[in-house]
């Protein structure tokens, strides 16, 4: 056990070496990206040893080695929880990040601030590992906020672009809403249970835990881009491609799902929270899959597919299968990072062209990248015996055999079928057919940094699912709950659907083009959500505040109440006064004339 804890800490310490080198200025600036990549590769190899020990023994460990603070009866100490989730996730995160770092050395080689970029990526990984290994809520919150601020810095890396700044701000603001939920949960646990340690919270297991769990669900909604707080995730594509790959594979977006998985001892008997996560996940996975169907930006399609997969993980938590959701996090990291890296390779080769309508015919021009892209797309759809199949098939089976909430599960099944549509669409538009890009574009994928990084993830996308699913406890084969013919039906329906799609495509490709339907507009404009939330709501707020400011302050207070009220009173007094002109001679004359006329009339009557 001593070796287990020591090597686990060495893994984390190895990652801090390049940052200390940068602080002490003991490095050659041109070699810094190589130092970072090497440190992560060594950390991955080191992390495999305690992971293998854990798989062999199944013994969890809590390392608590530095007491930090005591507030009355609350003890805060630096403690690491080396359990099933952290031990399985750490090697996956390190392996994927190692490949992304190598890819970044090729992709960002001309950037003048490449050393700072690598430092940011490394800090991003470290904060995620702090979040994963944290044993108390305070330490978890440090990692939680760490991935938030690093995502802001990395999405807005090209700060000269207005879109990048807007996207970075969006990411922060949407996550702030989620953080309110996290802080609410922390406050509730502190006031009611007087502890932030996870094992104590699980041991006390409060019966009325709806309030903190709603807070944690809100936090997961913000961080994992569930419906309502989802627009920041496709906008995050404004950052460099390595950032998109790291953000969407093994770091920030899975942090929210990971938080709910961490708290599964509280959620497993709470039907209310399970219903919330199930419905939220179902809406998210269907909505984002619909949005992905008509997008033309290659990175946006992959981003929406990430959001759809996060919704699927949320559904899995909702049907009380946290271990299955965690398995999907681990398998999803490999092919999602590879998909982003392949799209980055294509974008780089086509002079920053991201529109799939302007690609085509890349299968012969970039054979390796396109092979990896096809394998990644097939793994995403859950093609048998690729990595995605080992988790996705089990999720669909668990959903089909679940007795809860039929409409949510039906939405999930429709969304998973949409996955096949947008994955095939990328392959069809970007890789097949005639080239639709300018003839003078120089396509080159012969860089070892690019080839090796994608190759490593390609092997992961082919075999990681099998390796992970055969090594995680329990290793016994579960009993099949679904009839055999239903399992084979899925494969038959897939083949029939493919043949039918080809036939319909051949039949309709020469038909006259019609004006886009409402469903097409709904999908293309992302369900009108950004238009309403980012335009209409701020416009209404601004116009209301402007009217209230101008009406309440200017028209009412500064005009109606004080000056106008006083002026009206004074005007009445002044008109009363100015009615008398002060012409005494005229008054006397009029008085005299009146007397004379009256006397004359009196005398006349006599």
Swiss-Prot record:
It comes from the Eukaryota. GO terms for biological process: electron transport coupled proton transport; mitochondrial electron transport, NADH to ubiquinone; mitochondrial respiratory chain complex I assembly. Its EC number is 7.1.1.2. InterPro entries: NADH_DH_su5_C (IPR010934), NADHpl_OxRdtase_5_subgr (IPR018393), ND/Mrp_TM (IPR001750), NU5C-like (IPR003945), Proton_antipo_N (IPR001516). It is found in: Mitochondrion inner membrane. The chain crosses the membrane at residues 4-24, 43-63, 87-107, 117-137, 140-160, 171-191, 213-233, 241-261, 272-292, 310-330, 366-386, 413-433, 457-477, 482-502, 582-602. GO terms for molecular function: NADH dehydrogenase (ubiquinone) activity. GO terms for cellular component: mitochondrial inner membrane. It catalyses: a ubiquinone + NADH + 5 H(+)(in) = a ubiquinol + NAD(+) + 4 H(+)(out). Pfam families: NADH5_C, Proton_antipo_M, Proton_antipo_N. Keywords: Electron transport, Membrane, Mitochondrion, Mitochondrion inner membrane, NAD, Respiratory chain, Translocase, Transmembrane, Transmembrane helix, Transport, Ubiquinone. Coiled coil: none annotated. It is a multi-pass membrane protein. Core subunit of respiratory chain NADH dehydrogenase (Complex I) which is composed of 45 different subunits. Core subunit of the mitochondrial membrane respiratory chain NADH dehydrogenase (Complex I) which catalyzes electron transfer from NADH through the respiratory chain, using ubiquinone as an electron acceptor. Essential for the catalytic activity and assembly of complex I. This is NADH-ubiquinone oxidoreductase chain 5. The gene is MT-ND5.
């Amino acid at each position: 056990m001593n070796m287990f804890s020591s090597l686990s800490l060495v893994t984390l310490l190895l990652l801090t070496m390049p940052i200390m080198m940068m602080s002490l200025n003991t490095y050659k600036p041109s070699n810094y990206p190589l130092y970072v990549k090497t440190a992560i590769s060594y950390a991955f190899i080191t992390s495999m040893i305690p992971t293998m020990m854990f798989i062999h023994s199944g013994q969890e460990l809590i390392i608590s080695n530095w007491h930090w603070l005591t507030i009355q009866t609350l003890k805060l100490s630096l403690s690491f929880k080396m359990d099933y989730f952290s031990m399985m996730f750490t090697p996956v995160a390190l392996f994927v990040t190692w490949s992304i770092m190598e890819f970044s050395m090729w992709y960002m080689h001309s950037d003048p601030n490449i050393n700072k970029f690598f430092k940011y990526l490394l800090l991003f990984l470290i904060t995620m590992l702090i979040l994963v290994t944290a044993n108390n809520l305070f330490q978890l919150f440090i990692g939680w906020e760490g991935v938030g601020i690093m995502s802001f810095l990395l999405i807005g890396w090209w700060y000269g672009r207005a879109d990048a700044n807007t996207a970075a701000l969006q990411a922060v603001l949407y996550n702030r809403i989620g953080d309110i939920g996290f802080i609410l949960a922390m406050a509730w646990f502190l006031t009611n249970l007087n502890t932030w340690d996870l094992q104590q919270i699980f041991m006390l297991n409060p019966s009325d835990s709806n309030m903190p769990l709603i807070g944690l669900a809100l936090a997961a909604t913000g961080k994992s881009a569930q419906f309502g707080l989802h627009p920041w995730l496709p906008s995050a594509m404004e950052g460099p491609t390595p950032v998109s790959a790291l953000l969407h594979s093994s770091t920030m977006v899975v942090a929210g799902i990971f938080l709910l998985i961490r708290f599964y001892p509280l959620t497993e008997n709470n039907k209310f929270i399970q219903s919330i996560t199930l419905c939220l996940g179902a809406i998210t996975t269907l909505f984002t899959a619909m949005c992905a169907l008509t997008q033309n930006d290659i990175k946006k399609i992959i981003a929406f597919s990430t959001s759809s997969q996060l919704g699927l993980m949320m559904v899995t938590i909702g049907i009380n299968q946290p271990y299955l959701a965690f398995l999907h996090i681990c398998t999803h990291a490999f092919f999602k990072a590879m998909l982003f890296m392949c799209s980055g390779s294509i974008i780089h080769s086509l002079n920053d062209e991201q529109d799939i309508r302007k690609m085509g015919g890349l299968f012969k021009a970039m054979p390796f990248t396109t092979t990896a892209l096809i394998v990644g797309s097939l793994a995403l759809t859950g093609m048998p015996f690729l990595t995605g199949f080992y988790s996705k098939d089990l999720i669909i089976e668990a959903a089909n055999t679940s007795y809860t909430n039929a409409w949510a599960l039906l939405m999930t099944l429709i969304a998973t079928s949409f996955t096949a549509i947008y994955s095939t669409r990328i392959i069809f538009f970007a890789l097949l057919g005639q080239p639709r890009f300018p003839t003078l574009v120089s396509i080159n994928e012969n860089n070892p940094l690019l080839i090796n990084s994608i190759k490593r993830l390609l092997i992961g996308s082919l075999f990681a699912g099998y390796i992970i699913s055969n090594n995680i406890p329990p290793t016994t084969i579960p009993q099949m709950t679904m009839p055999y013919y239903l399992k084979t039906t899925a494969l038959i329906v897939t083949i029939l659907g493919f043949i039918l799609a080809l036939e319909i495509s051949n039949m309709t490709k020469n038909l006259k083009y019609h004006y886009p339907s409402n469903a097409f507009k709904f999908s293309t404009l992302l369900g009108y959500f950004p238009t309403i939330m980012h335009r209409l709501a701020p416009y209404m707020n601004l116009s209301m505040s402007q009217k209230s400011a101008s009406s309440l302050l200017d028209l009412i207070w500064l005009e109606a109440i004080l000056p106008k009220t006083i002026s009206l009173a004074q005007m009445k007094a002044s008109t009363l006064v100015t009615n008398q002109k002060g012409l005494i001679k005229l008054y006397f004359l009029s008085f005299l004339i009146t007397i004379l006329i009256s006397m004359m009339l009196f005398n006349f009557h006599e």
